[in-house]
């Protein structure tokens, strides 16, 4: 069986259907004896350029191992599903299981925004600081 990396973009009006699509596509892979090594739902993101007057899309990344028959069925499903506006399928040499750069950057931002233990500067503290500097002069 071969390894593939798949990214597909779903029309933003169909974002509610993404979990069902993912379930359908993973069942196609696993029923044929394949494996899903990595599955990341990147959510709704802004497109670099409009596609059919659409400016946002829901992105999904999958790293899979499957047979050619399962891959043919997946490409057929992608082609005839109107909710999928673009898809990209790349053949890989081995399974990729670590976080993608998109997901890693997202988790770094979550960690950074979650660190509320350091004091924040507010407008009141800045006013007090400028007032104390004026008094010193």
From Swiss-Prot:
It comes from the Bacteria. GO terms for molecular function: small ribosomal subunit rRNA binding; structural constituent of ribosome. InterPro entries: Ribosomal_bS6 (IPR000529), Ribosomal_bS6_CS (IPR020815), Ribosomal_bS6_sf (IPR035980), Ribosomal_S6_plastid/chlpt (IPR020814), Transl_elong_EF1B/ribsomal_bS6 (IPR014717). One of its GO terms (biological process) is translation. Signal peptide: none annotated. One of its GO terms (cellular component) is cytosolic small ribosomal subunit. PROSITE patterns: RIBOSOMAL_S6 (PS01048). Residues 99-137 are annotated as: Disordered. Pfam families: Ribosomal_S6 (PF01250). Residues 105-129 have a biased composition (Basic and acidic residues). Keywords: Ribonucleoprotein, Ribosomal protein, RNA-binding, rRNA-binding. Belongs to the bacterial ribosomal protein bS6 family. Binds together with bS18 to 16S ribosomal RNA. HAMAP family: Ribosomal_bS6 (MF_00360). NCBIfam families: S6. This is Small ribosomal subunit protein bS6. The gene is rpsF.
């Amino acid at each position: 069986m071969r390894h593939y990396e798949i990214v597909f973009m779903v029309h933003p009006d169909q974002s509610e259907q993404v979990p069902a699509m993912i379930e359908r596509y993973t069942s196609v892979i696993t029923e044929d004896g394949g494996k899903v090594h990595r599955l990341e739902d990147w959510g709704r993101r802004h497109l670099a350029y409009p596609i059919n007057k659409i400016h946002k899309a829901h992105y999904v990344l999958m790293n899979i191992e499957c047979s050619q028959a399962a891959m043919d069925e997946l490409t057929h499903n992608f082609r005839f599903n109107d909710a999928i506006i673009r898809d990209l399928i790349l053949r890989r040499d081995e399974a990729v299981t670590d976080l993608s750069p998109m997901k890693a950057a997202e988790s770094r931002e979550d960690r950074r925004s979650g660190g509320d233990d350091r004091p924040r500067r507010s407008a009141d503290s800045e006013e007090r600081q400028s007032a104390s500097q004026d008094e010193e002069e």
